[in-house]
């Protein structure tokens, strides 16, 4: 396959393909596509199976 011949991983190939498609979209569709890449990550500290604290990784705020 072409991605193997280029010496890149399949994940990198998919990322390049997705970026290429996203850049070729019209502005209204591009905004909707960019919103899909937003993700929220949180870390929860557990003690005895119960959540003790939650930390939002994006803003480093504890909840």
Curated annotation (Swiss-Prot):
Signal peptide: none
GO molecular function terms noted in the UniProt entry: proton-transporting ATP synthase activity, rotational mechanism
Subcellular location, record wording: Mitochondrion inner membrane
Cellular-component GO terms for this entry: mitochondrial inner membrane; proton-transporting ATP synthase complex
Main localization of the protein described in the UniProt heading: mitochondrion
Ranges in coiled-coil conformation: none
Domain of life the protein comes from: Eukaryota
Membrane topology, record value: Peripheral membrane protein
Annotated keywords: ATP synthesis, CF(1), Hydrogen ion transport, Ion transport, Membrane, Mitochondrion, Mitochondrion inner membrane, Transport
Known partners and oligomeric status: F-type ATP synthases have 2 components, the catalytic core F(1) and the membrane-embedded component F(0), linked together by a central stalk and a peripheral stalk. The central stalk, also called rotor shaft, is often seen as part of F(1). The peripheral stalk is seen as part of F(0). F(0) contains the membrane channel next to the rotor. F-type ATP synthases form dimers but each monomer functions independently in ATP generation.
Protein role: Mitochondrial membrane ATP synthase (F(1)F(0) ATP synthase or Complex V) produces ATP from ADP in the presence of a proton gradient across the membrane which is generated by electron transport complexes of the respiratory chain. F-type ATP synthases consist of two structural domains, F(1) - containing the extramembraneous catalytic core, and F(0) - containing the membrane proton channel, linked together by a central stalk and a peripheral stalk.
Similarity annotation: Belongs to the eukaryotic ATPase epsilon family.
Protein name from the UniProt record: ATP synthase subunit epsilon, mitochondrial
């Amino acid at each position: 396959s072409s991605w193997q011949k280029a010496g890149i991983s399949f994940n990198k190939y998919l990322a390049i393909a997705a970026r290429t498609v996203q850049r070729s979209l019209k502005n209204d569709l591009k905004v909707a596509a960019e919103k899909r890449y937003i993700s929220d990550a949180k870390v929860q500290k557990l003690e005895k199976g119960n959540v003790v604290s939650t930390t939002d990784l994006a803003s480093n705020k504890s909840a």
